[in-house]
């Protein structure tokens, strides 16, 4: 059995087709006609742009505009004027080939992103290397395997599936995907989920461990794959596949209905999004609102701070898409771990404990005031709420509320409409906020528990460090006690308490969260129906009995043992 990262859920059974990467050999030779070489480069770039637009158009018809935009983003990345200028300057100054110059510039750019300790930004390195490889192949006349010709029942095996490769997939012919690299946030995982193809990623050496035609069964939910299984194992996976199909069909009946427990307790089931266009997916998947809109995307992949108008349009579009449903927008959560040169952030030894999020914003009030103005203005177009990240004390919340009050006075003077009852809440993700939750609940309009960071900070663990990653678990009694305390403090003051971390969609944790009194579950759009079903299958009496047993546990192992008995 091969174990990897669960990239896209589902069961797959099929035959291996290995996507082999052609070796790209770049000659180290000098040229004399630099104009001709620059013309070669421009011709290759033009073909790349045309091919990419065609692929994106095909992808939009099959999986939608959001995922097609990943490919269109490659064009935007390449059209950064400084990149082509650097390549042509190298051709002229060093008298080297277009291939050599392109390779140097794009590899240097990719390496910058690869060094950033942020999984989403590291993905930019993969993007630039994909762009580089495709243009080099155009220059060298190399043609890749046409994935669109893969026969039905194919399990694609590759070192990595780039967006350009994935664009050619005919979804009904692909039973599964196995790769040697990639994670949950990689483009290969995102596109596999969009096409509903089970995928297991980051299986070391899988390309050399299988051969074309090998039989494979895989579980994209657990991250497991078996090559050339015996008849009994394949039959077991065939049964799992049928069960999975039945479950997907069953979930359809949970669309368009309220989120209510088996004994009538109503909760809100909303979505996490990262871009304005994601709001459409939230609506399509029956989300009841937006529980977390990360605004960092507006500040990335650009050379200047986004204007008030740019931000206003982004926030307004989400509010309008949600048509009166609640939209919680988290203010800028950025720090030294993210490469945004124009912000002038210094590299820090421990950026997750450093100058970031609200700490950065309250010192750079020029940037923060612009964002808050845009948010307050956008509140006139829907049920927008403002959420402040990484709060450790009530003084930070008071500072934000004071800034918003001043902005409202300005807008009154300017005759600009806004919601005068705009709510300002807190992302509860630090031990300090947990300890001060009783005080914070008196001044915050709502709490939203960010379990990802709350777990990391509470357990003092870097989840990227494999030696201590075992400590990173929301099932640890310390984390569960923190969550329970936050909810209790919020309830005492009568404010809404939600959760926007991964724990909100965990079927084993949901009964505990219901017992604790969580009001709002914010999950990925694709998890909405599954989470609603889990809640509908839960009775509060049983949840509370389970929570009593769990809260008496002293270790995570004890917690897991109790949950395993349910």
List the predicted regions and their residue ranges:
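Conserved alpha/beta-domain cores
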Residues: 248-566
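Non-catalytic, soluble scaffold/interaction modules
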Residues: 1-321, 327-334, 364, 368-372, ...
């Amino acid at each position: 059995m091969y174990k990897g990262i669960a990239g896209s859920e589902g069961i797959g059974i099929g035959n291996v087709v290995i996507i082999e990467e052609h070796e790209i050999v770049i000659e180290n030779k000098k040229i004399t006609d630099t104009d001709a070489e620059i013309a070669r480069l421009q011709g290759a770039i033009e073909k790349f742009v045309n091919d990419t637009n065609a692929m994106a158009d095909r992808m939009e018809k099959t999986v939608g505009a959001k995922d097609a935009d990943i490919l269109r983003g490659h064009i935007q990345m390449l059209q950064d004027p400084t990149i082509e200028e650097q390549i042509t300057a190298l051709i002229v100054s060093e008298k080297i080939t277009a291939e050599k110059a392109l390779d140097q510039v794009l590899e240097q750019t990719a390496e910058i992103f690869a060094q950033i300790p942020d999984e989403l930004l590291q993905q930019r390195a993969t993007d630039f290397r994909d762009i580089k490889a495709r243009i080099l192949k155009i220059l060298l006349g190399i043609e890749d395997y046409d994935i669109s010709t893969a026969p039905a029942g194919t399990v694609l095996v590759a070192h990595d599936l780039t967006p350009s490769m994935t664009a050619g997939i005919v979804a009904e012919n692909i039973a599964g995907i196995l790769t040697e690299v990639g994670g949950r946030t990689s483009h290969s995982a995102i596109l596999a989920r969009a096409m509903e193809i089970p995928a297991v990623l980051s299986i070391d050496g899988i390309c050399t461990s299988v051969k074309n035609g090998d039989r494979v069964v895989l579980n994209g939910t657990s991250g497991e794959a078996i090559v050339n299984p015996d008849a009994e194992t394949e039959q077991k996976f065939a049964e799992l596949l049928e069960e999975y199909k039945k479950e997907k069909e069953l979930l359809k009946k949970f669309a368009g209905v309220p989120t209510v427990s088996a004994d009538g307790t109503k909760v809100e089931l909303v979505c996490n999004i990262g871009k304005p266009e994601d709001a459409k997916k939230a609506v399509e998947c029956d989300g009841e609102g937006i529980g977390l809109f990360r605004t960092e995307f507006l500040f990335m992949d650009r050379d200047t701070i986004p204007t008030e108008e740019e931000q206003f349009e982004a926030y307004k579009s989400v509010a309008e898409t949600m048509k009166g449903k609640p939209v919680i927008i988290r203010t800028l959560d950025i720090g030294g771990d993210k490469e945004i040169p124009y912000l002038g952030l210094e590299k820090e030894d421990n950026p997750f404990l450093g100058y970031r999020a609200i700490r950065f914003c309250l010192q750079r009030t020029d940037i923060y005031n612009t964002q808050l103005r845009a948010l307050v203005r956008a509140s006139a177009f829907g049920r927008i709420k403002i959420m402040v990240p990484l709060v450790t004390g009530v003084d930070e919340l008071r500072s934000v509320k004071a800034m918003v009050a001043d902005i409202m006075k300005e807008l009154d003077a300017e005759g600009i409409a806004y919601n005068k009852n705009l709510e300002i809440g807190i992302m509860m993700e630090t031990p300090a906020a947990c300890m001060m939750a009783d005080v914070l609940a008196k001044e915050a309009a709502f709490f939203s528990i960010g379990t990802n960071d709350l777990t990391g900070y509470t357990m003092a663990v870097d989840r990227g460090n494999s030696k201590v990653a075992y400590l990173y678990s929301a099932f640890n009694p310390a984390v569960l006690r923190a969550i329970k305390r936050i909810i209790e403090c919020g309830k005492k003051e009568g404010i809404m308490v939600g959760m926007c971390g991964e724990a909100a969609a965990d079927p084993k944790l949901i009964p505990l969260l219901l017992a604790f009194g969580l009001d709002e579950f914010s999950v990925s759009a694709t998890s909405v129906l599954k989470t609603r079903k889990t809640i509908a299958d839960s009775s509060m009496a049983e949840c509370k009995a389970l929570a009593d047993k769990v809260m008496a546990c002293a270790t995570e192992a004890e917690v897991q043992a109790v949950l395993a008995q349910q």
